[in-house]
From Swiss-Prot:
The keyword Metal-binding applies. It catalyses: [[Fe-S] cluster scaffold protein carrying a second [4Fe-4S](2+) cluster] + N(6)-octanoyl-L-lysyl-[protein] + 2 oxidized [2Fe-2S]-[ferredoxin] + 2 S-adenosyl-L-methionine + 4 H(+) = [[Fe-S] cluster scaffold protein] + N(6)-[(R)-dihydrolipoyl]-L-lysyl-[protein] + 4 Fe(3+) + 2 hydrogen sulfide + 2 5'-deoxyadenosine + 2 L-methionine + 2 reduced [2Fe-2S]-[ferredoxin]. GO terms for molecular function: 4 iron, 4 sulfur cluster binding; lipoate synthase activity; metal ion binding. Coiled coil: none annotated. [4Fe-4S] cluster 1 binds at residues 84, 89, 95, 324. Keywords: 4Fe-4S, Cytoplasm, Iron, Iron-sulfur, Metal-binding, S-adenosyl-L-methionine, Transferase. This is Lipoyl synthase. PANTHER family: LIPOYL SYNTHASE, LIPOYL SYNTHASE, MITOCHONDRIAL. Residues 1-24 are annotated as: Disordered. CDD domains: Radical_SAM (cd01335). Its cofactor is [4Fe-4S] cluster. Its main location: cytoplasm.
Amino acid sequence: MTTVQEAVPNLIPTQDATPRPAPKKVEAGVKLRGADKVARIPVKIIPTDELPKKPDWIRVRIPVSPEVDRIKQLLRKHKLHSVCEEASCPNLGECFSGGTATFMIMGDICTRRCPFCDVGHGRPKPLDLDEPKNLAVAIADLRLKYVVITSVDRDDLRDGGAQHFADCIREIRALSPGVQLETLVPDYRGRMDVALEITAQEPPDVFNHNLETVPRLYKAARPGSDYDWSLDLLQKFKQLVPHVPTKSGLMLGLGETDEEVIEVMHRMREHDIDMLTLGQYLQPSRSHLPVQRFVHPDTFAWFAEEGYKMGFKNVASGPLVRSSYHADQQAHEAKIKL
């Protein structure tokens, strides 16, 4: 049996006797990042000496433009968060310069501690009941035609935040009736049925939930989450709302093998997932999970070919692909084929 340490180097099981910093007491509204964030997860991450040098094909210039500044100012004005900023997405400049953004609702503090993710952890504050309306106004101001809404995990809420998603969708459609909406939802751990019942009443145009990695690496990369649960979430939504495309994605470079990626893709199709994104994992800091490999663009292209053979309606596969990158184009192609 493969141990977590064998699966991902630079990890030590928590029972290791090596002293580790005492976890900080988490107060409501305080955001923990880096070493403080991962202090209580089931594995200990040994900080890398330095971040790995990126190959030429993955380097990105972050453009500075008035449009980027305008969108950031608009987000601040309406007290909104974008996952583009919170997760340090490499495509932030391109998306913001194009006048688009992926909005992150329910605050910027997550109740999970996934050590690949750069979003802060802590005890979130109560939901902002004005957020759905503020979000709708911002989207109308930006005159967007396609919007992705995602969120932090909110394990403190009875429905995991599903009603808040539905409220946002309703307000946005009231002000921008022509907009298409994609939701990138958490796993609704322990509350799937109630969350999906709410979601089905106000469904998005695309329903997205990321598996993130292969099942062997879940304990290291997604503590508190379950691979089969996430697959079931996507399939059960599809059964409730069969006309809405479902979507999921993986990060590559955490220690998975190509064979494991192909196996996960097959499982996705068995669970009626229509759309797939595959991108390169980039280590946000020395305290996050280390990059085990940089996947070559040719390998990403091969995964895309295999995905279409399996029956995915759209496959976005490349080093800089992220779940919401060119999401409008992905959805357009997928719906044409549905």
